[in-house]
Amino acid sequence: MGKIIFYEDRNFQGRSYECSSDCSDMSTYLSRCHSCRVESGCFVVYDVPNYMGNQFFMRRGEYADYMRMGMSDGIRSCRMVPQYRGPYRMRIYERENFGGQMYDLTDDCDSFVDRYRMSDCQSCHVMDGHWLMYEQPHYRGRIVYFRPGEYRSFRDMGYSNVKFSSVRRIMDLC
């Protein structure tokens, strides 16, 4: 079970809210959120309510100022990443609705272009495990968290101008 403490102001100041599960709208508990401390587990935090917008993966540690991380407006929602110790399986597709080239993944891939000659990934099906997909090769750029499920259109998820290029399994002891 994870535990994260959110603070209204930078450097762990102001009112706080302790969380150990998903939270779709932080404004229910805090008027703003500009720092946090992850005491256990791993979380994905979002800068828009309902798990939308830019995402940041957070493991155990202190995050005193979101501005330094590139988050412009603070945290608005969060998901706890559950512990997982089984096999990892994901199927990626070149086009929306599981169209075009398809590849099965069971491990990290630092470049879809280098490994598969696939220049874009527009949909995926996560069978097992929890994954982070990155906008750029070599695990750089914006991320999107994927848990088991079918993702027919990244555009419909709000990522119309994002071209995903690499993916990594979340294997931390979350």
Curated annotation (Swiss-Prot):
**SUPFAM superfamilies named among the record's database cross-references:** gamma-Crystallin-like
> Does the entry annotate any disulfide bonds, and if so which pairs?
none
Asked whether the keyword Repeat is assigned, the reply is yes
Q: Supply one GO BP term.
A: lens development in camera-type eye
This entry's Gene Ontology molecular function terms read: structural constituent of eye lens
> Which SMART domains did the record assign?
XTALbg (SM00247)
Keywords noted in UniProt:
Eye lens protein, Repeat
Q: Which InterPro entries match?
A: Beta/Gamma-Crystallin, Beta/gamma_crystallin, G_crystallin-like
Q: Where do the Beta/gamma crystallin 'Greek key' domain residues begin and end?
A: 2-40, 41-82, 88-128, 129-171
- Specify where the region named Connecting peptide lies, as residue ranges: 83-87
As for what it does, the entry says: Crystallins are the dominant structural components of the vertebrate eye lens.
Comment field on protein domains:
Has a two-domain beta-structure, folded into four very similar Greek key motifs.
- Similarity annotation: Belongs to the beta/gamma-crystallin family.
Q: How does it assemble?
A: Monomer.
Protein name, per record? Gamma-crystallin M3
Q: Which species?
A: Cyprinus carpio (Common carp)
What is the taxonomic lineage of the source species? Eukaryota, Metazoa, Chordata, Craniata, Vertebrata
